[in-house]
Amino acid sequence: MKLGFYPKLAADSIKKNKKLYLPYILTCCGISAMQYIMFYLSDYTENSGMTGGRIITTTLNYGIIIIVIFSIIFLNYSNSFLLRRRQKEFGIYNILGMSKKNIAHIYLWENIIIYLISTVSGITMGIAFSKLAELLLARLIKDNISYDFTLNKDLVLVCAAVSAFIFLLLFVRGIIALWKLNTLSLMKSENFGEKPPKANYLIAVIGVLMLCVAYYIALTTEKPLDALVMFFVAVILVVIGTYMIFIAGSVTMCKILQKNKKYYYQKDHFVAVSSMAYRMKRNGAGLASVCILITMVLVMMFGAGSLYIGAEDSLHTTYPRDFTFVMYAGGDQETANENFNVFCNDIDEFFINHNDNRKDIQKYTYAHYNMNVTDNVFDRGFDKPADKYAEVYFISLADYNKYCGENKVLEDNQVLINTIYTQYSYSNLIIGGESYVIREFVPTDDLFPNRDKAYLTPKIYIIANDINKIISGFDNEITHHTKFIYRFNSSLSQDKQCRMFNDLYNNMVANNNRGKYGSGTSWAIESLAFDRADFYGIYGGIFFLGIILSALFLVATVLIIYFKQIAEGYEDESRFTVMKKIGMTNREIQKNVNSQMKTVFILPLAFAILHLCFAAPIIMRMLTIFSVENTSLILITMAVIVAIFRVFYITVYKITSNVYYEIVSKSKI
């Protein structure tokens, strides 16, 4: 055969089947563009000096892995669908004298043509939109914006190589599938339909039970660490349960409707129900896949959106003041207090020299221990099970009243307490052999920021008149476990605070090296302005990745729906032809189409929203790890995301229903 025979035949086949191949090629273009953008941003954030670049690069690299894996899985599904639609055509080639080797040549050139078109177009799109993506990322992480345009040739080659690898896998998978078929199966494969399965109540009930268990987990899991683990257990149960309900439950529903003769034998319902029942097993699996993808998009955008929108609240919760200084002092209590005063005086001098009028100053001391808590007895023993331990904080009543705006009064044998991630139901507590009456439970967030919750261990805060007296009963090295806190807000701009942070740190290091703060002393500095970059690097990077992955899953959802509707349209074409011959008009056909399509489309969206509503509590528990706890803001974010997606979904419904109708009616609407 002539050299250009196979490429020409492959190109003609693609043109002839453009209704199938155009969405597929556009999807491949979009995936190639996303891959290039992710590679570009990963390289840019690593080498450009962008604030929080290291964290963002790591986040984007995880995103690249997810995109490549999902691309392989999804394009394999799409390619399998195209092969199924093309097998009759390949069968004709076989009857006309072509061997499977010849057909493989055609299939090879089809893949080469699609690869070249999609990769060149996709990378071109990626290059064109890479700067826009960079600007979006810079805005999300609140970094300086650069309008310089760069083209990295190495990234173009890497992206082309990744796409080539994916298409090679698709080609090998397709050749194996074609090689297993004989001429008769090639000719009839398009007509092979799955037999209507019998209603399986057992599978449907198991599916419902799985969803109930998953919902129960989501509603009852309290601790963020448990939520992080149990969330994935719930996800697995939801995925399996959804498939069971859509496959078995939808079949059962159709069988029940068919038994209802008054309903079933109306012309508005007869065609829709019978056609759905004929292929319901495959239809149910397809609907379940769409439902899972929609749920992934909603959950991802809900979580990432809530995280980013609540970032500023989270930042100020994590850093209650612009500057926080923590000192761990050695020596006896008196010496430790003297060293802390010297430490604070140096800080004061530094900020005065920088013309900073500080405000909202807090200066206090607390003791921190890991203790065994058995019933109402607190001790320092380490011979108990791990679940009996808690972090216990001791702070003086004077400091509590001063910085929490209270005026509490306690007797020497009385204490105030607060607990996180543990329940304490006793009216007293015993420490060092002494019993103390619990007067009341009080909030302590003004002294201990909510970020301490991220450590996920049980915490008990104890406020007393004299904490040294309490802890002296079980600790001879009191200062070894004592922390001195000095924090305040700055009158300087965020930029000035960032610029002077390194000078401040170096000044404190120099003083410490000279032994100015005593032996055995260590300290730490926290700056809200300086740490903001890394903070938004994490939150902005996660939100950006959520946007990219959601876009990818949306493309997959649309293409699955589109392919599904084309397949069902061709399968229903002969049935509607019969209906037209017995007198059904195009208007009646469209009415039947709408009846079927509304049923098919509303179920995945309805179940996805249901999944999201039950997932919201456990997602909110996980968000507390990042100190995002504004419930009203989180719920508003969820409502907005659902509303936006609903509009998008309805648009997809209208487009795909028109495609389906054009096929079954053989006339334009």
What are these regions (language model features)?
Residues 1-32, 196-201, 210, 245-294, ...:
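N-terminal Sec/SRP start-transfer signal
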